[in-house]
Amino acid sequence: MKIKNSLKSLKTRHRENRLVRRKGRVYIINKLNPRFKARQG
Protein backbone atom coordinates (compact mmCIF):
# COMPACT_ATOMS: atom_id res chain seq x y z
CA MET A 1 0.00 0.00 0.00
CA LYS A 2 1.31 3.42 -0.94
CA ILE A 3 0.99 6.30 1.52
CA LYS A 4 0.67 9.70 -0.16
CA ASN A 5 -0.18 13.25 0.88
CA SER A 6 -2.55 13.70 -2.04
CA LEU A 7 -4.57 10.88 -3.60
CA LYS A 8 -5.92 12.85 -6.55
CA SER A 9 -3.25 11.67 -8.98
CA LEU A 10 -3.45 8.07 -7.74
CA LYS A 11 -7.21 7.96 -8.23
CA THR A 12 -6.89 8.42 -11.98
CA ARG A 13 -4.31 5.64 -12.46
CA HIS A 14 -6.99 2.96 -12.95
CA ARG A 15 -10.69 3.27 -13.71
CA GLU A 16 -11.69 0.79 -10.98
CA ASN A 17 -10.14 2.89 -8.19
CA ARG A 18 -12.61 3.85 -5.47
CA LEU A 19 -12.11 6.55 -2.86
CA VAL A 20 -13.37 5.48 0.60
CA ARG A 21 -13.18 6.95 4.11
CA ARG A 22 -12.55 4.53 6.95
CA LYS A 23 -11.89 5.55 10.56
CA GLY A 24 -11.05 9.12 9.56
CA ARG A 25 -8.53 8.08 6.90
CA VAL A 26 -8.94 8.29 3.15
CA TYR A 27 -8.14 5.18 1.13
CA ILE A 28 -8.11 4.15 -2.51
CA ILE A 29 -9.17 0.57 -3.07
CA ASN A 30 -9.19 -1.48 -6.23
CA LYS A 31 -10.76 -4.93 -6.21
CA LEU A 32 -9.54 -5.89 -9.68
CA ASN A 33 -5.93 -4.84 -9.17
CA PRO A 34 -4.98 -4.54 -5.48
CA ARG A 35 -1.56 -3.04 -6.24
CA PHE A 36 -3.27 0.36 -6.61
CA LYS A 37 -4.20 0.47 -2.91
CA ALA A 38 -3.23 3.73 -1.22
CA ARG A 39 -3.78 5.66 1.98
CA GLN A 40 -3.61 9.37 2.61
CA GLY A 41 -1.20 10.34 5.37
Curated annotation (Swiss-Prot):
Domain of life: Bacteria
Claim: Ribonucleoprotein is one of the keywords in the record: yes
Keyword Ribosomal protein: yes
Example GO BP: translation
GO-annotated cellular components: ribonucleoprotein complex; ribosome
Stretches that traverse the bilayer: none
Family matches, as PANTHER family: 50S RIBOSOMAL PROTEIN L36 2 (PTHR47781), LARGE RIBOSOMAL SUBUNIT PROTEIN BL36B (PTHR47781:SF1)
Protein's name in the database: Large ribosomal subunit protein bL36
Annotated organism of origin: Rhizobium meliloti (strain 1021) (Ensifer meliloti)
Taxonomic classification: Bacteria, Pseudomonadati, Pseudomonadota, Alphaproteobacteria, Hyphomicrobiales
